[in-house]
A protein has these predicted regions:
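Aromatic pocket-lining residues of Rossmann-like dinucleotide-binding sites
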Residues: 166
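Phosphate-binding beta-alpha-beta segment of Rossmann-like dinucleotide-binding domains, i.e.
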Residues: 90, 98-149, 161
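An N-terminal-biased, well-structured beta-alpha scaffold segment characteristic
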Residues: 1-95
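Glycine-rich Rossmann-fold phosphate-binding loop(s) that bind the pyrophosphate
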Residues: 155-156
Length: 168
């Protein structure tokens, strides 16, 4: 019998393919909204495992209704939404992906840094509102990041990745 996994969100296709390759039966929630807890409980009742995100509340109420689950794992760095003590009490192991979003988060931070330095948000709004007028080289360029010092608060996974992007 194939093990059934409830996937509560649209996940990267590579991950879905890996699970399908291992012969799991996947039920994918494809709506562009999170499941309500009632929907989550009803769907999880017929599955062996749950693959979720931070928006699903996995509390003692959920776990009491779905104590048959063999594992819960979530695509997120943290797991504040999961009652670990209750899951442990039901003998359900919980997994998470501590480095899943580090590269993307560092990329976004890097992009935001450039966008702010070069006034991209302001200039985008100016263009959208039809107020572009003329190009002002001294007023519209913002400032160069070259030879600037970057302060990074914390050198965890994301801070280190950001530092490597900004090195030299």
């Amino acid at each position: 019998m194939k093990k059934k996994i409830l996937v509560s969100r649209l996940y990267p296709k590579e991950g879905i393919r890996l699970l399908e390759k291992e012969n799991f039966h996947l039920t994918l929630w494809e709506e562009k909204r999170p499941m309500t807890q009632v929907e989550l409980i009803e769907k999880a009742k017929s599955h062996h495992a749950l693959l979720c995100t931070l928006t699903e509340k996995i509390d003692s109420h959920f776990l009491t209704q779905c104590s048959h689950l063999e594992i819960i794992s979530q695509f997120a760095v943290g797991y504040d939404n999961i009652d670990i003590d209750a899951a442990t009490g039901f003998g359900i192991p919980v997994g998470f992906t501590p480095d899943a979003m580090s590269e993307a988060t560092a990329d976004i931070a890097f992009g935001l840094m450039i966008a702010v330095a070069r006034k991209m948000f302001f200039l985008h709004k100016t263009i959208i509102n039809g107020r572009w007028g003329y190009f002002n080289p001294t007023g519209n360029l913002g400032f160069e990041l070259k030879d600037k010092t970057l302060g990074i608060f914390g050198l965890g996974r994301i801070g280190v990745k950001m530092a490597k992007r900004c090195k030299n």
